[in-house]
Amino acid sequence: MISLGHLLVLGAALFCISLAGIFLNRKNVIVLLMSIELMLLAVNVNFIAFSRQLGDTAGQLFVFFILTVAAAEAAIGLAILVTLFRTRHTINVAEVDALKG
């Protein structure tokens, strides 16, 4: 059986990998978006671990709401990314940081 410590280590490892993805690759918007989604997944693993440990289903229900918001965030982020690529022909963060008025 998987203990609480194992799940917390898994959540911490996923969170650290996502932080490394954000800090080490600041050029590609797709990698940044995937790193943020991985960070939300790490938080969900911790919610489920504590919910299972305490025997309360509120944490598991909260995870469903987080997954719904994360799916909407990913859809909106990818739609913005497609529009950005069509107008600027790049997804490099360094090249699209200037706003045009």
From Swiss-Prot:
Which parts pass through the membrane? 4-24, 30-50, 62-82
> What is the topology of this protein in the membrane according to its UniProt annotation?
Multi-pass membrane protein
Catalytic reactions of this protein:
a quinone + NADH + 5 H(+)(in) = a quinol + NAD(+) + 4 H(+)(out)
- Which top EC class is named for this enzyme in its record? translocase
Where is this gene product found? Cell inner membrane
UniProt keywords (A-Z) are: Cell inner membrane, Cell membrane, Membrane, NAD, Quinone, Translocase, Transmembrane, Transmembrane helix, Transport, Ubiquinone
- List its EC numbers: 7.1.1.-
**What are the recorded GO MF terms, alphabetically?**
NADH:ubiquinone reductase (non-electrogenic) activity; quinone binding
GO CC annotations on file: NADH dehydrogenase complex; plasma membrane
Q: Which InterPro entries does this one have?
A: NADH_UbQ_OxRdtase_chain4L/K, NUOK/Mnh_C1-like
Q: Which GO terms describe its biological process?
A: ATP synthesis coupled electron transport
Pfam family membership, one: Oxidored_q2
**Which superkingdom heads the taxonomic lineage of this protein's source?**
Bacteria
Its predominant location is membrane
Task: Tell me its family.
Answer: Belongs to the complex I subunit 4L family.
State what this protein does: NDH-1 shuttles electrons from NADH, via FMN and iron-sulfur (Fe-S) centers, to quinones in the respiratory chain. The immediate electron acceptor for the enzyme in this species is believed to be ubiquinone. Couples the redox reaction to proton translocation (for every two electrons transferred, four hydrogen ions are translocated across the cytoplasmic membrane), and thus conserves the redox energy in a proton gradient.
Which proteins does it associate with, and in what oligomeric form? NDH-1 is composed of 14 different subunits. Subunits NuoA, H, J, K, L, M, N constitute the membrane sector of the complex.
NCBIfam families named among the record's database cross-references: PRK05715.1-2, PRK05715.1-3, PRK05715.1-5
Q: Tell me what this protein is called.
A: NADH-quinone oxidoreductase subunit K
Gene name as annotated: nuoK
